[in-house]
Amino acid sequence: MTRVSLLWAVVVSTCLESGMAQTVTQSQPEMSVQEAETVTLSCTYDTSENNYYLFWYKQPPSRQMILVIRQEAYKQQNATENRFSVNFQKAAKSFSLKISDSQLGDTAMYFCAFMK
């Protein structure tokens, strides 16, 4: 069975708008899983905003950034897109990406992003 490498840089990004800073942090530097396994990537963020969007992007070896999934903060239901789903915990400021049935094509660097 082929190994799927989910390399992801430790990313801390800050978005400055209206004098307020929003910080997004990913804690896991790299993950490798067997093909067909399920993997969860974690992200936390800090904001005082009530209405915002969270995104997961992937950057495969071709270097292009691809939107995987997005979550609106005002929605209670977690977003789902094919084999990708999120666990959005607004009170805990946590936003995890779950990749089910991982495939070789999932090999990429993954980024969590925030937008007001």
Swiss-Prot record:
V region of the variable domain of T cell receptor (TR) alpha chain that participates in the antigen recognition. Alpha-beta T cell receptors are antigen specific receptors which are essential to the immune response and are present on the cell surface of T lymphocytes. Recognize peptide-major histocompatibility (MH) (pMH) complexes that are displayed by antigen presenting cells (APC), a prerequisite for efficient T cell adaptive immunity against pathogens. Keywords: Adaptive immunity, Cell membrane, Disulfide bond, Glycoprotein, Immunity, Immunoglobulin domain, Membrane, Receptor, Signal, T cell receptor. GO terms for biological process: adaptive immune response; immune response. SUPFAM superfamilies: Immunoglobulin. Residues 22-116 form the Ig-like domain. Residues 1-21 form the signal peptide. The gene is TRAV38-1. Alpha-beta TR is a heterodimer composed of an alpha and beta chain; disulfide-linked. The alpha-beta TR is associated with the transmembrane signaling CD3 coreceptor proteins to form the TR-CD3 (TcR or TCR). The assembly of alpha-beta TR heterodimers with CD3 occurs in the endoplasmic reticulum where a single alpha-beta TR heterodimer associates with one CD3D-CD3E heterodimer, one CD3G-CD3E heterodimer and one CD247 homodimer forming a stable octameric structure. CD3D-CD3E and CD3G-CD3E heterodimers preferentially associate with TR alpha and TR beta chains, respectively. It is found in: Cell membrane. Glycans are attached at residue 78. GO terms for cellular component: immunoglobulin complex; T cell receptor complex. Its main location: membrane. This is T cell receptor alpha variable 38-1. Disulfide bonds join 43-112.
